[in-house]
A protein has these predicted regions:
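Toprim catalytic domain recognition across nucleic-acid enzymes
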Residues: 1-326
Length: 326
């Protein structure tokens, strides 16, 4: 009932806003102008971001990084800000700690867990294809249509659901066998060998509208028959499907606080407990993990001597323009 009411509300909003406002703009300005429930606020966001970029004035700042042999630490102030706007202050901090002793004042470990990503609907697939391969939404849809209609490799593409219905669960072993080749073979082999079952989070009848999430069909595909574009999209969908049979990615986030000559420094790292679904798919957005280092076994009270200082000059950057993915 709620899904029906939501769809009806969107249709009425399209009529009230789209048709009437478009007609009003066209008559008012004697030009082919249009307005819409989605397009007009989206255009406003684009204009606002463009104005922010044009008004932006870059500023110089500096960071101080110390090499302690096995790991690096970064200076920060009392507000955990690492940027130093004054070059003389940055130089003074660098000289102050050169070859000095650093002492660990705190080691903080927090447990983290990331569940497998949800299955693809068309929008999310278009977003990832744009991030990874710069494909436009239309290009991704066309590729998906070929994989659905010509190759019979993937299910219906024009879906807005990221879930499966319970009646599909008995068909999953056959779908796994269909992708048991190429780079997917070892993963599928492990799923069958360890008798992994699909995550309950992927199955929800109430959240499936006309069509379920995009997954492989029960037809085995000759990968050599796919062109590069088709193989890329097919691989994205298959890997996302396979992640649903794996547990969460579990890890410990480690933050170390140190002092040297009255200045505060910190380092961040990550210790993997269970790789889980990341055995299959590394993830599209891993900037945070890439910035973290592998830390040695550290304890409060440990001391280290500064081996080297890195004083880095940087400039503040304007807000990024929106892409088709964002």
């Amino acid at each position: 009932l709620n899904l029906y009411a939501a769809a009806q509300s969107r249709a009425e909003a399209d009529w009230l806003v789209g048709i009437n406002a478009t007609r009003a703009l066209t008559c008012k300005f004697n030009a082919q102008l249009s307005a819409g429930r989605v397009q007009t606020p989206t255009l406003a966001l684009l204009v606002q971001r463009e104005e922010e970029i044009r008004r932006f004035v870059p500023k110089d700042y500096y960071t101080v990084r110390a090499d302690l042999g096995n790991f690096f630490v970064t200076w920060h102030n009392g507000k955990n800000q690492t940027a130093i706007s004054d070059k003389e202050k940055a130089d003074a901090i660098a000289e102050k700690i050169r070859e000095k002793k650093f002492r660990i004042t705190e080691v903080k470990k927090t447990f983290g867990s990331t569940p497998p990503p949800m299955l693809y609907d068309l929008t999310e697939l278009q977003r990832d294809a744009n991030k990874l391969y710069q494909y436009s939404p239309k290009q991704t849809l066309n590729i998906m249509q070929r994989l659905y209609e010509t190759h019979k490799a993937l299910t219906y593409p024009r879906t807005d659901s990221r879930y499966l219905t319970a009646d599909l669960v008995p068909t999953l072993p056959e779908r796994l066998r269909a992708v048991n080749h190429g780079e997917f073979g070892p993963i599928v082999g492990e799923i069958f060998r360890t008798r992994k079952s699909i995550s309950h989070a992927c199955v929800n009848n109430a959240k499936v509208t006309d069509h379920h999430a995009i997954i492989p069909t029960e037809e085995q595909v000759n990968l050599l028959s796919l062109n590069q574009e088709e193989k890329r999209i097919y691989t994205l969908v298959v890997k996302r499907f396979l992640t649903c049979f794996y547990p969460s990615y579990d890890f410990k986030k480690i933050r170390v606080e140190l002092t040297a000559e009255g200045e505060s420094f910190s380092a961040a790292g990550r210790e993997i407990i269970e790789l889980g679904w990341k055995k299959v798919e590394k993830g599209i957005e891993e900037d945070e993990e890439a910035a973290e280092q592998v830390l040695p076994n550290l304890r409060q009270g440990d001391s280290f001597v500064c081996k080297n200082i890195q004083l880095k000059a940087q400039k503040t950057a304007p807000p990024a323009r929106y892409t088709e993915a964002t």
